C-alpha cells in the first residue's frame, strides 16, 4: 500500500495546484541559541498582510501545512485569503539545523523558537501582533508561547489540542525512528486497518508522505514526545494563562483529544474564545476530503472576527 504512495508521489508533485501560481515563497534567516531555524513566508502579492505563524506537530515539520495537491494546502489557503503565512521548523526538525541532543527541543524550548520567529515576523511585517496556529504538539508549544508572551499574540488557534498527557510511558531514545507507516499513522482507516480513501484522497496522502521523507528523513527529536507521554491527569497547555482569544478546533474522531477535555480548557480561556467540533474529522482533518473545507473556513471566520 505504501509502495503505491512512493511510486505515485512523483506524479503528484508535478501536478497542478490550486494556489501555486499566485503564492510567492521566501525564506528568512533566523537564528536562536546558535541554531539556524527555517522560517518561510507564503504570500500573495505585496503590501500589508496580517501575519499568521504556524507551529508544526511532533515528528514531522512545517511542510505538513503545505500539502500542495489541489487546494489542500492550508498555508496557501490563508495566503490566498490575505494573510502572510509563516512556517517555522523547530530546532532539529525539517529544514532547521540538526541538534545533537534530541531531548533538547522539548515543548518549552520549542515555545522559545516560536517566540523568536514571532519577533522576527513582527520586525519584518511591522505588525503589532501575530496570529498563531498550532497543530497537535504545536498546540502545546504555541500555547506555552502565547501564555508567556501575551504581548505578541493577537489570536491563537489550537488545532487538535493536546490538552493533557496521552499515556505515561518512558521515552529513552533521544530521536524517533521515522517510517512510512508511522507517517501515515494519523490517517483514518477502515475496519481492516487499510487507509480510508473516501476520507483521505490517495494523492493527498502521497504528497504528505513524500514530503515527510524528503524533509524529515529517518529521524526526528524526541523531546516533545517525552513531554506528551505523561499521565492523563497532567495538563500540558497553560490555557488559564493565555490572554489572546483562542479557537479550539477538534474532530470528534481524534484519538488524541476529546471534546470534553476541550470544553474543560475553554472554561479557562479569555472572552472571545470558542470551541469548534468537526463531526467525523480526525487528527489530520486538514487533509481529509469531507472535512478540510469546513475546518479551514471555521478558522478563517474566527480570525476575521
Model regions: which residues?
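N-terminal cap/lid segment of alpha/beta-hydrolase-fold proteins
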Residues: 21-47
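Catalytic histidine-centered segment of alpha/beta-hydrolase-like enzymes
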Residues: 281-292
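Short beta-strand element of the alpha/beta-hydrolase
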Residues: 49-57
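Alpha/beta-hydrolase active-site loop
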Residues: 104-124
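Conserved alpha/beta-hydrolase "acid-adjacent" motif
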Residues: 255-261
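Conserved alpha/beta-hydrolase
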Residues: 72-97
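Short substrate-entry loop that stabilizes the transition state in hydrolases
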Residues: 58-69
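Alpha/beta-hydrolase
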Residues: 167-249
